[in-house]
From Swiss-Prot:
UniProt pathway: Carbohydrate degradation; pentose phosphate pathway; D-glyceraldehyde 3-phosphate and beta-D-fructose 6-phosphate from D-ribose 5-phosphate and D-xylulose 5-phosphate (non-oxidative stage): step 2/3
Source organism: Arthrobacter sp. (strain FB24)
Pfam family, one: TAL_FSA
GO molecular function: transaldolase activity
Protein name according to UniProt: Transaldolase
Length: 371
């Protein structure tokens, strides 16, 4: 019997795990997910690293070594995160080889405090890429206005990029433009375009979480009927943008030079509302050439009881437009929602990063006292 995760893979969906820790690497649980549940990549973010590093004792030895070496807290966090990502890259190397680098990818994010600093982001992206030193790493850069320039510049250096925290269709268009500009510059710089890979991480469940609150406040039957629909509608229309902008003459010239399209990646795919089906943002977002990065709980639910019925994206464009129009008619501002979500998303990552630095600083101090 074919498992639901295999069915997703057969439908053109690449399954990535939205989590990474040293424990997963050392105990073999990540390898098991590759072997049994069709996982072909990993994404990380500041919140994931904060949870990994501050729970358990997996990082105590490294922190003690860094303390003895006199490393700063930033140097220690950099060493820990890049080591885990490099080890994960090695684990996924056979997948990368089998897919010519399309999958087998491991993402690591630039310091989120640099989200509004173009030059700082470019420098950090290069630093991370050099330190990890693996062909299958993706450097995550947030899709802020300042980040767009950094995305282009990083790709122009031949570095593969995961563009993160995309919420709006307008910003997604700008992301694809930044990607194609980066490839055009990379070509001019003499890079092999077939070796430059990118995904655009479009966040899904957070859109519903915010819009559902506003629908509840309105409270009418018409409003309640729209709950749980905005996130899917937004993502489906993003795929329509993807189809449009990778069918242009501009893209055809890049493709002739060996370029591969920047794939849409569905992020934030765990349901926030427990009344919704736990596989909602997986089985309802099936389309050729997409990535779906899932927390393990969502992955397990999909493997256990996900119902895959083929492409559930391209046949839903009319309904998706109708959903967004209905929200607008109720006075819910799409632009207001997506701007708020970008701001909140960045704030959450910055807060997690600062908490991580504070916790590691305390651990370094304790290690120095113990020695």
């Amino acid at each position: 019997m074919t498992t639901p995760t295999q069915q997703l893979s057969d439908a053109g969906v690449s399954i990535w795990l939205d989590d990474l820790s040293r424990g997963r690497l050392q105990t073999g649980t990540l390898r098991k997910l590759i072997e049994e549940k069709n996982v072909v990549g990993v994404t990380t973010n500041p919140s994931i690293f904060h949870a990994a590093i501050t729970s358990g004792t997996d990082y105590d030895a490294t922190i003690a070594e860094q303390a003895a070496a006199g490393s700063t807290v930033e140097e220690t966090v950099f060493e820990i995160t890049t080591t885990d990502v490099a080890d994960a890259c090695d684990l996924f190397a056979p997948v990368a080889a089998a897919t010519r680098g399309v999958d087998g990818r491991v993402s690591i994010e630039v310091d989120p405090r640099l989200a509004w600093d173009t030059a700082g982001t470019i420098a950090e992206a290069k630093h991370l890429y050099k330190k990890v030193n693996k062909d299958n790493v993706l450097i995550k850069i947030p899709a802020t206005l300042e980040g767009l320039e950094a995305i282009t510049a990083t790709l122009a250096e031949g570095i593969s990029v995961n563009v993160t925290l995309i919420f709006s269709l307008e910003r997604y268009r700008a992301v694809i433009n930044a990607f194609q500009s980066g490839l055009e510059q990379a070509k001019g710089n003499g890079h092999d375009l077939s070796k430059i890979h990118s995904v655009a991480s479009f966040f899904v469940s957070r859109v519903d979480a915010e819009i559902d609150k506003r629908l509840d406040a309105i409270g009418t039957d018409e409003a309640k009927a729209l709950k749980g629909k905005a996130g899917l509608a937004n993502a489906r229309l993003a795929y329509q943008v993807y189809e449009e902008l990778f069918s242009t003459e501009r893209w055809a010239l890049l493709a002739e030079a060996g370029a591969l399209p920047q794939r849409p990646l569905w992020a934030s795919t765990g349901v926030k509302d427990p009344s919704y089906p736990d596989t909602l943002y997986v089985t309802e977002l099936v389309a050729p050439g997409v990535v779906n990065t899932m927390p393990e709980k969502t992955l397990d639910a999909t493997f256990d009881h996900g119902v895959v019925t083929g492409d559930t994206v391209t046949r839903g464009y009319d309904d998706a437009n109708a959903t967004l129009n209905a929200l607008d008619a109720l006075g819910i501002s799409y632009n207001d929602v997506v701007a708020l979500l970008e701001s909140e998303g960045l704030d959450k990552f910055v807060a997690s990063w600062k908490e991580l630095l504070g916790d590691v600083e305390g651990a370094l101090a304790s290690a120095r006292k113990a020695s």
